[in-house]
A protein has these predicted regions:
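Short Asp/Glu-rich motifs
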Residues: 1, 35-36, 106, 132
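C-terminal cap of metal-dependent C-N hydrolases
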Residues: 86-134
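Active-site core of metal-dependent hydrolases
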Residues: 1-11
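His/Asp/Glu-enriched, well-ordered alpha-helical/loop segment
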Residues: 9-95
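Short low-complexity, flexible loop/linker segments enriched in glycine and/or proline
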Residues: 4-5, 39-42, 110-112
Length: 134
């Protein structure tokens, strides 16, 4: 087995995060030859990242949103104009889920995407009917 440093693979995300180092997940390949599966969906990036880095504890998962939000903004040095605060652009997503864990675990559908206070995407929740055999 490969020990650290890996010749190709992921770094020690859990350890870096635990030490307070800014860790962010991202995707720069969208439907290209390097990664044809890339679609720009950061929830997919996070879902795969949590599996690949073995971040599986409930608290870790509940805090993982930072890897694709706050920490990414810090990495790109746009943290002063990022976040849900008075005076900042209203950029956010609303998922059909009770909490962050369920949004990731259930691959919850995106209900709203808001950019600069304008609704860009609105999805009507799916209606599901389950019929059990008698």
């Amino acid at each position: 087995f490969d020990t650290y440093p890996k010749r190709r693979g992921l770094t020690r995300v859990k350890e870096l995060d635990a030490e307070g180092i800014n860790v962010a997940f991202g995707e720069d390949d969208i439907k290209d030859p390097w990664y044809p599966m890339g679609n720009g969906n950061m929830m997919d990036v996070l879902h795969m990242g949590l599996h690949a880095t073995q971040i599986m504890g409930y608290t870790e998962i509940m805090n993982s949103y930072r890897f694709i939000t706050k920490n990414g903004a810090r990495t790109m040095q746009v943290q002063d104009s990022y976040g849900i605060e008075v005076g900042k652009p209203a950029n956010f997503l609303i998922f059909n889920a009770k909490n962050w864990y369920d949004a990731l675990n259930e691959r919850a559908e995106l209900l709203y995407s808001v950019h600069n206070g304008n609704v860009l995407v609105e999805t009507k929740p799916a209606e599901v009917t389950v019929t059990l055999p008698e």
